[in-house]
Amino acid sequence: MARRARPRQRGAAVVRPVRGDGGGVGGAAVRWALSNRADPAARAVADRHYNRQHVGADQFVPPGKCLVLLIEAPAPALWISHSPDPRFVKHRWPGAWVCTAFRNEGAWLSSELIREALAATVDAWGPPPAEGMLTFVDPTKTAPKEVPGWCFRRAGFKSDGFSEGGLVALVLPARRFPAPSPPLWRGVDARWDTRQQRLFR
């Protein structure tokens, strides 16, 4: 009888295997650690993202329910999942979760980090909404020869037109989400971020 693989140590964090999801990342290790909207380390990475409107401002996460994930070493990465109230959504995808920021400053494949962040999101929040996950990409911020949002497309997202502001809209259907897998823990205690609901079930 095969023994269950033990979590591997990577720095100070315990790396847990991701359960197979049939969507392209089964068996990979979750590298994301749980952060929150008040974490200065996460804010520093957000300040370097092209969609940051007020660099240095304390707030880098939209109001409402959110999940902030961070990688600090050997190179930073940031992911923010947001579940806006459909009553206040102005785009044509009300009900969808939204990735409001993703930045990978390391050498990892961005598509793999995206799938791992999705796995951590469904672990925290439960099954995704029927509308799935949405993200917007500014085509003017990508290299001329690059496909806007290519790493998201590699992770299973599909193009769904444009926002009113001309951003490329990419959507991941609910059926394409990976199986849930918990993020790692780090020094910031996200339990005090009351908007990160359903983290402790």
Predicted regions and their residues:
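Non-catalytic substrate-recognition and accessory regions of acyl/acetyltransferase enzymes
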Residues: 2-145, 150-201
